[in-house]
UniProtKB/Swiss-Prot annotation:
Catalysed reactions listed for this entry: Endonucleolytic cleavage to 5'-phosphomononucleotide and 5'-phosphooligonucleotide end-products
Enzyme class: hydrolase
Protein name as catalogued: Endonuclease 5
Signal peptide limits: 1-20
Region described as Substrate binding: 144-193
Chain's gene name: ENDO5
Annotated a divalent metal cation 3 binding sites: 21, 26, 148
InterPro entries, sorted: PLipase_C/P1_nuclease_dom_sf, S1/P1nuclease
Free-text cofactor note: Binds 3 divalent metal cations.
EC number(s) stated in the UniProt entry for this protein: 3.1.30.1
Amino acid sequence: MRLWIVSVLVLTHLVHGALCWGKDGHYTVCKLAEGFFEDDTIAAVKKLLPESVDGGGLADFCSWPDEIKKLSQWQWTSTLHYVNTPEYRCNYEYCRDCHDTHKHKDWCVTGAIFNYTNQLMSASENSQNIVHYNLTEALLFLSHYMGDVHQPLHTGFLGDLGGNTIIVNWYHNKSNLHHVWDNMIIDSALETYYNSSLPHMIQALQAKLKNGWSNDVPSWKSCHFHQKACPNLYASESIDLACKYAYRNATPGTTLGDEYFLSRLPVVEKRLAQGGIRLAATLNRIFSAKPKLAGL
């Protein structure tokens, strides 16, 4: 019996809730990833997804960790969506930064990516380990956190909680800097360039992956030292981008308009694409292992 049957009821109820950037952004990352899945990955993901998807794919469930994190039984996951870094250092170090507010080590987005990668990898290599983990949850958490770590302000400064306490105006709307990067840049892009159609935006990013970014894709896929996942690299990239683009010219009270939007949108688009490529590469490395997940 599949271990995630009870969770399916929660999943199917929550995934159809109110739409937000979390759903759009994470849907985009996972939809891009699906286009790069190898055959073994396609088969494994299909086995792990809830049967109620009605033909849908991984992308339909990639916002689930955001939907559940405020529920009492899942509040422990809230710290796994980000990693805070010291003010103005503009760098990331796992041993220094990956902990929760109580200094429990490994409780951050990069630690979570390592953890859920190892869970899936352990079960893929040894079918006896399948019984120890909820592999559907592991897949969905890994897929979601891979998107989170590519959002620059999910590695932002501790002092402003990744831009959450920096109050700005996005055009005529009051917001905070983190929300601008989570929501407003993508929302404005959808309205301005894609007739408010997320599928059209995804198609545009898919075209860039085949053309403008095609020479970069192999390096995006690669992982040093034969690791299955490289979240430390992704977090280091993100805090560098946060300093160069997110925080720059975005002090409290600033009105952010066309200049900020047009110069930051390419960064957001590329991070969505990199997140998709790297999620696919990670899952391909995991599910290429023997034996397969035959016990599911």
